[in-house]
Amino acid sequence: MKIDILSIFPDMFSGVTGNSIIKKAIENERVAVEVTDFREYAEGKHHIVDDYPYGGGAGMLLKAQPIFDAVQAVKEKQPETKPRVILMDPAGKRFDQKMAEEFAEEEHLVFICGHYEGYDERIREHLVTDEVSIGDYILTGGEIGAMIVMDSVIRLLPGVLGNKDSAVTDSFSTGLLEHPHYTRPADFRGMKVPDILLSGNHAWIEEWRDKESLKRTYERRPDLLKNYPLTDKQKTWLKEWSDSK
């Protein structure tokens, strides 16, 4: 996979690409990440990327020209691919695990990270394929959001995680929150690991994990259960918890 990031603050990404799983993914050639300062594509000797909005109003808008030209330039470097051009914007579609899995199937992603009051609307209408939001709040720019999406996508690529099952069993990958985890010692200052996890009975352990995953979701994110395909056993557990309230 190739990931291009367009930002006027490219140095923000050095910490993300130079550490942990993303660094290893780059070193192992599972992904190539290139960060471009789209100010370099702005016309005029001062390379101005923003301007006042027509009709007045507060703030400055990112101009269409430098972003259109920057996207065209990264496309020309990968002419064999048809990239998803992703605009990080609070008005976009809420990012979730399903979207991460969808993006992970692509060959080429281009992230546009904005600043100031917003974008010239022609960028949305004629350039991007996806508008993505990481939540209902405002950040200074799109860089942090792009980092979040990029991390979520890269860890899904084949060969990136050491354990191939890790991405499958993570919270949200199954549609439910993940079950509790414990490691040694079995008794830490009187706080004990559930006996069933020490039993060696894998069928019991899997059922316990399934039940705890459902319970955690029911207690913390009941909205996730709205369209979840519950088994008969899971329905019985939910009824027990509901009746005990």
UniProtKB/Swiss-Prot annotation:
InterPro entries: Alpha/beta_knot_MTases, tRNA_m1G_MeTrfase_C_sf, tRNA_m1G_MeTrfase_TrmD, tRNA_m1G_MTases_N, tRNA_MeTrfase_TRMD/TRM10. Its main location: cytoplasm. It catalyses: guanosine(37) in tRNA + S-adenosyl-L-methionine = N(1)-methylguanosine(37) in tRNA + S-adenosyl-L-homocysteine + H(+). Its EC number is 2.1.1.228. It is found in: Cytoplasm. One of its GO terms (molecular function) is tRNA (guanine(37)-N1)-methyltransferase activity. GO terms for cellular component: cytosol. The keyword S-adenosyl-L-methionine applies. CDD domains: TrmD-like (cd18080). Keywords: Cytoplasm, Methyltransferase, S-adenosyl-L-methionine, Transferase, tRNA processing. GO terms for biological process: tRNA N1-guanine methylation. S-adenosyl-L-methionine binds at residues 114, 134-139. Belongs to the RNA methyltransferase TrmD family. PANTHER family: TRNA (GUANINE-N(1)-)-METHYLTRANSFERASE. Homodimer. Specifically methylates guanosine-37 in various tRNAs. This is tRNA (guanine-N(1)-)-methyltransferase. It comes from Listeria monocytogenes serotype 4a (strain HCC23).
